[in-house]
Curated annotation (Swiss-Prot):
GO biological process terms on file: regulation of signal transduction
Pfam families: SAPS
Gene this protein is translated from: PPP6R3
Protein's organism: Gallus gallus (Chicken)
Protein name: Serine/threonine-protein phosphatase 6 regulatory subunit 3
Low complexity biased stretches: 729-739
Chain residue ranges for the region called Disordered: 628-659, 693-715, 729-755, 767-787, 840-873
Length: 873
């Protein structure tokens, strides 16, 4: 929305680019230069694509900024240059990848002496990496021509950005064939051997770490690629070279050469751990103890790697006994002399990984060296080192759950549960695991009884004891573990049994009880357990089985059919379209010249229905349709009626006849005022000549219905106003607020409805009635009115009225096309209330006036023939 309406402030860059002498630094000083570049600003990109601008951008990246500059702005232009070149603009990438002069200038950064500027190296690596990903063939061909590229990468491997560039070269090339060519090229350049040579005590720590991390990433990337491409015809040459025995032997010989360098040893062990990474299947009951990497066996360990490590196990064992020299460490707990150190911790991790392979030759070597006993001693010696405790716990869990052993030639032999598991026997007999657990537990309880602090390894010791108990009951070596416990001295065995039932049981109970008593949410899984525990007698077993079957069927159907179908709920747009389509099918054709049979049928139906009505009730029928007519002022109505003068003034005779129907013999300017506060128990019929009435004549009503006061002089307003017309209604004939107000329309003559025309004409001539004079002298005002056609439903009949709007007062005027008579609505007009036909039927036939002549009856009959039944507005 913000950009759509162009509400953002215009960039100053466009103004600068209009200058001919604008410089690159002036553009780089602008804050929004990066945004404009990424937004593909055409002028800016054309400026940056100039040869001198691209050379300056590359120069900012590879050249050291002056030392005398302020540190805050010293690397401003190199940073902006890097962002501009790596904004992933195709034109810039094409120019950099195609012009060899720019690539040579960029490549010259590697020719600098080590160590490189870390920040500039990151800029260089980022630019070259995006070029490798966008233009892999051009960049790889360029690098292959540079015979010293691999040498320079190895030279600057201590810089982390150069290590990232090497990994980008292996990962950013997605097509299989170009990637395979890059791997073969790097393998021919002996990249693996050169990285292994860096892991040497003579090299510095940064080079150790980056070389080790590079080799580890190469191993992981190669294995992942092998899993993704199952049908790969060519193996990964880098991984194959790294898994060779001579490479592993070279790596181990480097770290054990003369002096012991902790950085080199740790880096080499990290490479070995990556080579030994396998995802083994978890064993039951030891999920919490085993590391997440043991989920399943995905990678197979090359036996050449195991053989090379086995030959150097004695050297690793010596590291456990005599680690590299470390200074005494003072901690809050006490003095550590010597501390565990990273070297010994990684050696124990290596032993744990070797135990995961479960190779018999390696296990035999560990038994002879008593490496398990040494790490157990370290477990109880270093009370507060939880990293050490975790690795020892994993080693013991792996030994207890190792049912199979791999031979030296890689085959796996099945052992009987009572067979010889030498490593397990070594753990129980020589290492005396049970005795040491009991001694440590009793020592901790004694220390706590004296007010001392609980040992830090007690949690791990509890888990190890639970692991032994679980292996006794279940697990692949349950029989052997039970036999080994029985072979323990009787005193030790009794202490162990007492410990399992008392101390260990209480500890487990205490660990499983929630410390905070809160209201727990009831789980749905608990319901299933409750249902399963319900017992049934033997006689009802078949019935219960059948009930279970029915419940399964009902549950599956209930779950599938529960709720509402999504198809039943369409989008709002769909619903709107459907309703709109249906509206288009409705026929709005209205025919005002309907046959008189329809009106005759409705009149007969009304007569039938009225037989069931209470004739003597003055109360209003709530189910009866009310007719509303707006009685306007006479002059306005005449003016409105004159808009269609060609229809309403066909002849002087018709004009005279229709005008007489609306004239009052008393005063046409009289105004009617109705007291609405009178009680609503009145009965009257204010039928307008256009209304179709049923029943007897109404001429005998006379002036008793209305008692009018002396009319007031009319105001010279040019419009009939009824607001000042006062009418005194009797208490029983008060006007009802909800009485219908009729609208006058005309239609074809209908003879059956003209029987009582005489009474209607007599009523119109009564002095107390309200009359409206329809004249045609307002034709000059018709030019200011707008005419609109309006459709009015008259019962089952349809009529089209012309809606005329006065331009001055915006008064809506309804005009009938047939009758050429119109009514209008103004804010000052009153409602003329019409009583329904049933009141007229109750009036006696003597209401007809005595002076009604046959000529009047004939005119009224003719008029009523043109009247149609009014429908509600």
């Amino acid at each position: 929305m913000f950009w759509k309406f162009d509400l953002h402030s215009s960039s100053h860059i466009d103004t600068l680019l209009e200058r001919e002498d604008v410089t690159l630094k002036e553009l780089m000083d602008e804050e929004d230069v990066l945004q404009e570049c990424k937004a593909q600003n055409r002028k800016l990109i054309e400026f940056l694509l100039k040869s001198e601008c691209l050379e300056d951008l590359v120069s900012f990246i590879i050249e050291e900024p002056p030392q005398d500059m302020d540190e805050k702005i010293r690397y401003k232009y190199p940073n902006i240059s890097c962002e501009l070149l790596t904004s992933d603009v195709s034109q810039i990438n094409d120019r950099l990848g195609e012009e060899e002069s720019l690539l040579m200038k960029l490549y010259s950064f590697l020719l600098n002496e080590s160590p490189l500027n870390p920040l500039l190296a990151s800029f260089f690596s980022k630019v070259l990496s995006i070029l490798i990903s966008r233009k892999p063939e051009q960049i790889v061909d360029f690098l292959k021509k540079k015979h010293d590229f691999v040498d320079l990468v190895i030279k600057h491997i201590g810089t982390s950005a150069i290590m990232d560039l090497l990994l980008r070269l292996l990962t950013c090339i997605e097509p299989p064939q170009p990637r395979q060519e890059v791997l073969n090229w790097l393998n021919e350049e002996r990249i693996i051997q050169r990285l292994v040579e860096i892991v040497h005590p003579s090299q510095d720590e940064d080079r150790h770490s980056n070389a080790s991390q590079s080799l580890c990433e190469i191993i992981r990337l190669s294995r992942d690629q092998m899993l993704q491409v199952q049908n790969s015809s060519e193996p990964d040459p880098l991984l194959a070279s790294l898994e060779k025995r001579e490479i592993i032997e070279q790596l181990l010989s480097n770290i054990f050469h003369k002096e012991k360098n902790e950085s080199a040893i740790v880096s080499a062990i990290q490479i070995l751990l990556t080579l030994l990474e396998t995802r083994r299947q978890t064993f039951e009951g030891h999920i919490e103890i085993c590391p997440p990497g043991m989920s399943n066996s995905t990678y197979s360990v090359n036996k050449s790697v195991l053989e090379a490590i086995k030959a150097r196990l004695s050297s690793f064992h010596e590291l456990l006994l005599e680690p590299p020299k470390k200074s005494v460490m003072k901690t809050t707990w006490g003095v550590l002399d010597p501390p565990v150190g990273n070297t010994r911790l990684n050696v124990i991790r290596l032993i744990s990984s070797l135990l995961q392979t479960n190779t018999s030759s390696v296990n035999q070597e560990l038994i002879e060296l008593n490496s398990i006993g040494v790490i157990l001693d370290m477990f109880f010696k270093y009370t507060w080192n939880n990293f050490l405790h975790t690795q020892v716990e994993i080693c013991i869990a792996l030994i207890l759950a190792s049912p199979l052993e791999s031979t030296e030639n890689g085959t796996i032999t099945d052992q009987d549960s009572t067979g010889d598991n030498l490593l397990l026997k070594h753990l129980f007999l020589k290492c005396q695991l049970i005795e040491r657990i009991l001694e440590a537990w009793e020592m901790n309880e004694k220390k706590q009884a004296e007010g001392g602090r609980r040992h830090g390894y007690m949690g791990h010791l509890t888990r190890i004891a639970n692991c032994i108990v679980h292996s006794t009951d279940k697990g692949p070596n349950s029989t052997l573990v039970q036999q080994l416990i029985k072979e323990l001295p009787e005193e030790v065995r009794e202490r162990w049994e007492t410990f399992c039932t008392s101390s260990l049981g209480e500890t487990n109970k205490r660990n499983t009880v929630d410390l905070v008593t809160t209201c727990h949410i009831h789980s749905s899984s608990d319901d299933e357990i409750d249902f399963k525990e319900t017992g049934f007698s033997q006689d009802s077993s078949l019935q219960q089985a059948f009930s279970d079957y029915q419940m399964q069927q009902m549950t599956s159907n209930f779950i599938d059919q529960f709720g509402f179908n999504d198809e039943k709920f369409a989008d709002q747009d769909d619903i709107g379209n459907v309703s709109f389509d249906r509206v288009s099918d409705i026929n709005f054709t209205l025919n005002t010249n309907e046959s008189g049979n329809i009106a005759l049928f409705e009149a007969c139906c009304k007569e039938r229905i009225q037989q069931f009505d209470d004739g003597g009730s003055d109360e209003e029928d709530i189910w009866e349709e009310k007719h509303i007519a707006f009685t306007p002022e006479s002059q306005r109505r005449s003016s409105s009626g004159s808009t269609d003068s060609e229809e309403s003034t066909d002849s002087e005779e018709e004009d005279g006849t229709k005008q007489d129907l609306f004239e009052s013999h008393a005063n046409t300017e009289d105004k009617m005022e109705v007291d609405l506060n009178e009680p609503p128990n009145w009965s009257a019929n204010f039928d307008v000549p256009m209304e179709t009435a049923h029943g007897t004549n109404l001429d005998s009503v006379g002036s008793d219905v209305w008692s009018t006061e002396e009319p007031m002089p009319a105001k010279e307003t040019g419009w009939a106003s009824f607001s000042e017309f006062t009418s005194s209604l009797s208490s029983t004939d008060s006007l009802r607020s909800n009485s219908p107000v009729e609208m006058e329309t005309n239609t074809e003559p209908m003879d059956p409805l003209s029987a009582n025309a005489t009474g209607l004409a007599t009523q119109l001539e009564t002095p107390g009635s309200v009359a409206m004079e329809a004249s045609s002298d307002g034709e000059e005002d018709a030019e200011n009115a707008d005419k609109v056609t309006e459709t009015v439903m008259n019962g089952s009949m349809k009529e089209t009225l012309s809606l005329t709007v006065d331009a001055k007062t915006e008064t809506a005027v309804f005009k009938s096309e047939e009758g050429k008579l119109s009514t209008s609505q103004d804010a000052s007009c009153k409602y003329v209330v019409e009583e329904n036909a049933e009141v007229a039927e109750e009036a006696p036939s003597a209401l007809q006036p005595a002076n009604s002549s046959p000529e009047q009856r004939t005119d009224q009959r003719t008029l009523l023939g043109e009247t149609s039944v009014n429908g509600p507005v």
